[in-house]
From Swiss-Prot:
One of its GO terms (biological process) is DNA recombination. The gene is ruvC. The keyword ATP-binding does not apply. Mg(2+) 1 binds at residues 7, 139. It catalyses: Endonucleolytic cleavage at a junction such as a reciprocal single-stranded crossover between two homologous DNA duplexes (Holliday junction). This is Crossover junction endodeoxyribonuclease RuvC.
Length: 164
């Protein structure tokens, strides 16, 4: 299963693609879509949508996992972040992909084992889990963490489904 993890942001939207093969997680790609703050906000949203649409077309993930961000420095930041999340979600839904949302605490719990882990701990664990030569850039690392969270959650959900 190919999973696209997304860490939405109005300036940088991180993406991370992993492949889950049995119990193995394999790194496929990661990076970030950068928008120019000098541009009008609708143009920035369009860049996020278009960039993620191109990534989806290239890697053909089976599922998308998005970080559900609920904290922001101020109301305006929260609104912009919500709109960036919307652009990311629409890019996935537009081509029929299922979208799953995870809180930062759920992501940290799945990757490190505690929902109160520090960012550096999460980054080091991602490096180890995916056998990366170095720690990924921050937004990409967060997106890889979201993808790993979904990989773990999907496995647990499948077990519970089979129990019923």
């Amino acid at each position: 299963m190919i999973i696209l993890g997304i860490d939405p942001g109005s300036r940088k939207t991180g993406y991370g693609i992993i492949s889950k093969q049995g119990n193995r997680l394999i790194h496929v790609d990661n990076g970030a879509i950068f928008t120019q703050s000098a541009k009008d906000f609708p143009e920035r949203l369009e860049k996020i949508f278009t960039g993620l649409s191109e990534i989806i077309a290239q890697y053909r993930p089976e599922v998308v996992a998005v970080e559900d961000v609920f904290l922001a420095k101020n109301a305006q930041s929260a609104l912009k972040l919500g709109q960036a999340r919307g652009a990311a979600i629409v890019a996935a839904v537009n081509v029929g992909l299922p979208v799953h949302e995870y809180t930062a605490m759920q992501v940290k719990q799945a990757v490190v084992g505690t929902g109160r882990a520090e960012k550096a701990q999460v980054q080091q664990m991602i490096k180890a889990l995916l056998n990366l030569p170095e720690v990924a850039q921050e937004d990409a690392s967060d997106a890889l963490a979201v993808a790993i969270c979904h990989a773990h959650s999907a496995g647990i959900n499948a077990l519970f489904k089979n129990v019923r």
